[in-house]
């Protein structure tokens, strides 16, 4: 399995937007994303860098694979 690099919040948001997720709101230091066809919400920390494990957890919650996420990142 491929390793997820350390990313900036904007990069994570951009990748999820390419899969149909949209920014619902931003409260404090987190960006909340939703998708009309998915009941889950994604909470992306708006810090200088997102820890390596956070995108991996969000990928699973969004119903994606790591490979799909990484290919959209390029």
Features from the language model and the residues they span:
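Basic nucleic-acid-binding interfaces
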Residues: 1-74
């Amino acid at each position: 399995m491929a390793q997820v690099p350390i990313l900036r919040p904007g990069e994570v948001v951009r990748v999820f937007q390419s899969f149909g997720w949209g920014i619902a709101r931003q409260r404090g230091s987190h960006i909340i994303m939703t998708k009309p066809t998915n009941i889950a919400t994604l909470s992306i920390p708006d810090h200088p860098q997102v820890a390596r494990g956070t995108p991996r957890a969000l990928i699973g919650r969004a119903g994606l694979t790591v490979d799909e996420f990484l290919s959209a990142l390029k």
